[in-house]
Amino acid sequence: MIQYQVRSVQLLNLINDLISEKLVSDPFYQRNLVWRDLHKQDFIQTILLGFPFPQIFISKGKIDLEKRISIASIVDGQQRCNAILGYVNNQFQVNNHFFDDLSPDEKAVFFKYEVAVIELDLDH
């Protein structure tokens, strides 16, 4: 039986885990990136409006002894994570605005958005 934990993660923490590679895409689970800008824009609009989106599934981290960090893999949610990173890196616009065009208050609300994450323990 697969063990799992459901938790809520602030979008800022998810972004930081992706940037620092504490959370990585695993080709074993993930298909190639297929979302076009329109899909990414619609998804980011969901976050900006404060609507929920489906959980992101990750596998519990393996330990990188050299870096002394735990590295988790995205099982389901690569397209969404890629869209989030692309938006905060100003790779596409939503409603004719890049992320950097948002006011400080809008950015804070975006970063505080809570993401539902299901962490799977696939080693048991």
Report the location of each language-model feature.
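Basic- and aromatic-enriched surface patches that contact anionic nucleotides/nucleic acids
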Residues: 1-14, 23-37, 41-124
